[in-house]
Amino acid sequence: MADADFLIVGGGIVGLATAYRLQSMQPGCRVRLLEKEAEVGQHQSGHNSGVLHCGLYYKPGSIKAVLAVRGIRQMVEFCEEAGIKHEVCGKLVVACNEEELGRLRNLEVRGRQNGLEGIEYLEREAMLEVEPNVGGIAALRVPQEGIVDYPAVCRELKRRIVENGGVVVTGATVTGLREQGGQWIARTPVDEYTGTFLVNCAGLHCDRVAEIAGEKRETRIVPFRGEYYKLKSGREGIVRNLIYPVPDAQFPFLGVHFTRLIHGGMEAGPNAAMAFAREGYLKTNISLRDMWDAMTYPGLWRFVAKHPRMTALELWQTFSKRRFCRALQKLVPSIKLSDIEPGGAGV
């Protein structure tokens, strides 16, 4: 008999939320979660800007749109119930020129279609009342957007999973997976674990976990590092809340933006440059295996061929603080080079 009904690989917020939800849907089910690090939420879940996204950008009716709108409501309810620090502060999406006004109006329509109530289109004068130092000519105010302490969410999910009878095993790197006798067997350096159902929530390593489980790896993870600057102490007040540019649908990134952090301070960024390791939070983090995996993947080269200018600009921005600052000045013209210093990074 298997040790667990559900064997989950990956202790980020997706794996933890999956485990907790399974326990809620099937009370009494046996859940075992395997996490390779010494604690949960150590990678993407702990290396992000802490934004609660509300689903503004997604195609109405799409799974992303439905889940984003539903998810932010559930996350806010969860945080309120658990006493986790969060704030629904809203955000501004700013049009910097006439060309972006049409896309801004389209976003307004899309947001309403996705069920986001209270969206406001602000002309420049009204926009400056909300954010006195912002540039641009118009903005959307989206009240649903917020900020949260995601590592605290991960810790609380882990606590509840264990309280409900689940098992969270840390320091358990999955090195092998096989299906045998109607159950899955996960091998780690120190033990083997069994489960009737296997759930892959391994984040940046999910393609490799799928491969060792016997799936053909047609898609690969190509790591991109998002680097942030932060506003220096005493200059955080230049920006009050969250400020985003109007996204360009041609590109897969939102562009640099300003994010107020839940524990204080203000971040600006990120850029998006290829990382040399899947856990490459520093420029000096290099994994030859990860680099080989990325460089031999045709999908990467198709992406570069499709977006050569953007690829070059993002790489330039990675190594040039001045270039990064110029990108920020499109949203807040009064930002100076001396106002920013290196912050965190995510992959």
What is each stretch, according to the model?
Residues 1-14, 32:
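Beta1/beta-strand and adjacent pyrophosphate-binding region of the FAD-binding site
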Residues 14, 39, 205:
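Conserved Rossmann-like nucleotide-cofactor binding loop
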Residues 17, 177-287:
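Flavin-dependent oxidoreductases
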Residues 23-46:
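Glycine-rich FAD pyrophosphate-binding loop
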Residues 50-126, 136, 256, 277, ...:
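Dinucleotide-binding Rossmann-like beta1-alpha1 core, especially the glycine-rich loop
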Residues 125-128, 220-224, 230, 234, ...:
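Flavin (FAD/FMN) cofactor-binding core of flavoprotein oxidoreductases
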